[in-house]
Design a protein with these regions (language model features):
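Bacterial N-terminal signal peptides
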Residues: 13-24
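Central antiparallel beta-sheet cores of small beta-barrel/beta-sandwich binding domains
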Residues: 30-138
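Structural recognition of the beta-strand scaffold that forms the well-ordered cores
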Residues: 173-179, 208-214, 250-255, 285-290, ...
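Aromatic-lined carbohydrate-binding/catalytic grooves of carbohydrate-active enzymes
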Residues: 181-183, 191-299
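Aromatic-lined carbohydrate-recognition surfaces of secreted/lumenal glycan-active proteins
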Residues: 249-265, 315-332
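Glycan-recognition surfaces
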Residues: 274, 320-415, 436
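Carbohydrate-binding surface patches
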Residues: 403-406, 411-413, 449-488
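C-terminal beta-strand-rich structural cap/linker in extracellular carbohydrate-active enzymes
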Residues: 505-526
Length: 526
């Protein structure tokens, strides 16, 4: 081979070497990128034809890991993130104070798949994942920068304030049933029909329970014209409403003024009038409207105007629809709830099926609110937990009695298809229900407190009173009330509302031994 040929060969070999190095470098870079946890990882779950996505935005820096989790509209930062080879761990802290929960995550990476498990209760992902089951996330981007869920949506300017009619509805506190406390995302058409059948036949309808309310997770997306669609759990919402109506009952739904509901389903943002007309066409009688992702789109002080948008839409829908405001008592809702057409408004955060939650909401948090309720507009301390199993029978009697004295909506939250005798005796206590449904529409107030004992009284029509003697303590105790403290004269007639027994005319006052966490409840008539 001559020198010229050798030179060409050397150049070619050098070029091939450089090319090989470039290929190796590219492969190494790809391998390095795939070996990094940095990126956006998505977990998709399907519930009733609705696809929900949870996004994990992760950034790896050596053995440190940072980022955030986007579930529906909630962006939650991760902490204590570490990487050890193909495995990473991190922690998410949810809630505050005594409601705080630490959720620990472990993730194993295999190329562009991430298998995630979690422990600690609650958390993101499907039902199994929330109890520590695995989720498989796919890498959809190598950029781990968190992106807000609604950055591309137009912003609505809150309207000027004006008064909206209450529609002449809810002249007494609404009574019925709601799916969330017991069924959560597991509610479907068959469940609702079964509940309607039971309420129509087990005495609840006759006692006044008429609303069958479907809470979150019924929603799909929107059609080409922007109309809200129900998901496959509810194949024909109008047919379901017709069925419920055929039982002499009414059907309610749930939505949010934000783009997403609390569970991450389609909200009514920028579709308020359209949704109200759709619901009316289906035959809906009640709408619970939950703030949720509206917190991302509006300032906290905008709540009054934002709820007014849906109040106007419901009143213009052509159908009487009860309007239930659910924004957890923020922004002094009791002062403006009636002016947006609200028939009831939540006064607190969510109730839990335990004594501490129920008693704190019912006794402590309602005291400053009692003057704001009245005919057509009611304080709502949340749905009832009676029959769900987290409290004793005495505690459930206290729960029901207190809600009645508060003139609260009596919305059952248990599986009414299977009522125990104890639960039935509480929910169907017509003496106590009559206190709640009294046409005067006054909310009861706390008239005495002595340590763990409290006396509450509710004015009733024709000069009568309902009086509850409550024992929040750990042991039975005697509790008394004097008629003079309530400006009751003479010897009024007294009826024991749990014993269903007339006690005749009683002078001076009334005393009873009340069990721990229990109640004695009487009706006093002049």
């Amino acid at each position: 081979m001559n020198k010229k040929a050798k030179s060409k060969a050397a150049v070619l070999l050098a070029a091939l070497g450089v090319f090989a190095l470039m290929l190796a470098a590219t492969a190494w870079a790809r391998q390095a990128a795939s070996a990094s946890f940095t990126g956006k990882w998505a977990v998709q779950t399907n519930v009733g034809s609705t696809t929900r996505e949870t996004d994990y935005f992760l950034t790896q820096n050596g053995t440190a890991l940072s980022g955030a989790i986007l579930n529906g509209y909630r962006m939650t930062n991760i902490s204590e993130g570490t990487v050890n080879g193909s495995q990473a761990t991190w922690v998410v802290v949810m809630g505050t104070g005594d409601q705080q929960r630490r959720i620990a995550y472990t993730a194993t990476m295999d190329g562009d798949e991430l298998t995630i498990t979690q422990s600690g209760g609650g958390g993101f992902g499907g039902r199994g994942a929330g109890r520590g089951g695995p989720m498989v996330a796919k890498r959809v981007s190598s950029d781990g920068t968190p992106v807000g869920p609604f950055d591309s949506l137009p912003r609505i300017t809150p309207p000027a304030l004006h008064n909206v009619s209450d529609g002449g509805m809810a002249r007494t506190p609404p009574m019925g049933w709601n799916s969330w406390n017991h069924f959560k995302a597991l509610v479907d058409d068959a469940t609702v029909r079964g509940v309607a059948d039971s309420i129509a036949s087990n005495g609840m309808k006759d006692a006044g329970y008429v609303f069958i309310n479907i809470d979150d997770t019924w929603e799909a997306g929107r059609d080409a014209n922007g109309n809200i669609q129900a998901n496959s759990k509810f194949p024909d919402m109008k047919a379901l409403a017709d069925y419920v109506h055929s039982k002499g009952l009414k059907l309610g739904l749930y939505s949010s003024p934000g783009p997403k509901t609390c569970a991450g389903y389609e909200g009514s943002y920028n579709h308020e009038a359209q949704d109200a007309k759709t619901w009316a066409s289906w035959g809906i009688d009640y709408v619970k409207y939950d703030w949720c992702s509206a917190s991302v789109m509006f300032k906290q002080g905008d709540e009054h105007a934002v709820y007014q948008i849906m109040g106007d839409a419901l009143r213009a829908s052509g159908r009487p629809i009860v309007f239930s405001l659910c924004q957890y008592g923020q922004e002094d809702v009791q002062t403006w709830g009636p002016s947006v057409g609200g028939n009831l408004w939540r006064t607190t955060g969510d109730i839990q099926d335990n004594w501490n939650s129920m008693s704190h909401i019912g006794f402590d948090l309602q005291v400053p609110l009692t003057s704001y309720a009245g005919v057509g507009h009611w304080n709502d301390p949340d749905m009832m937990e009676v029959g769900n199993g987290g409290m004793t029978n005495d505690e459930y009697k206290t729960h029901f009695s207190l809600w009645a004295i508060l003139a609260a909506p009596l919305i059952a939250g248990n599986d009414v298809r299977n009522l125990s005798d104890d639960t039935k005796s509480i929910l169907l206590n017509k003496d106590v229900i009559a206190v709640d449904q009294d046409p005067m529409g006054a909310e009861g107030t706390r008239v005495a407190k002595n340590g763990d004992t409290e006396v509450w009284a509710k004015p009733l029509a024709r000069g009568a009173y309902a009086i509850g003697l409550f024992n929040r303590g750990a042991s039975a105790t005697d509790i008394s009330v004097k008629w003079s403290d309530l400006k009751i004269n003479g010897k009024p007639k007294v009826r024991d509302l749990w014993a269903h027994k007339d006690l005749g005319k009683v002078a001076d006052g009334y005393s009873a031994q009340v069990p721990s966490h229990g109640v004695a409840m009487i009706r006093v008539e002049p």
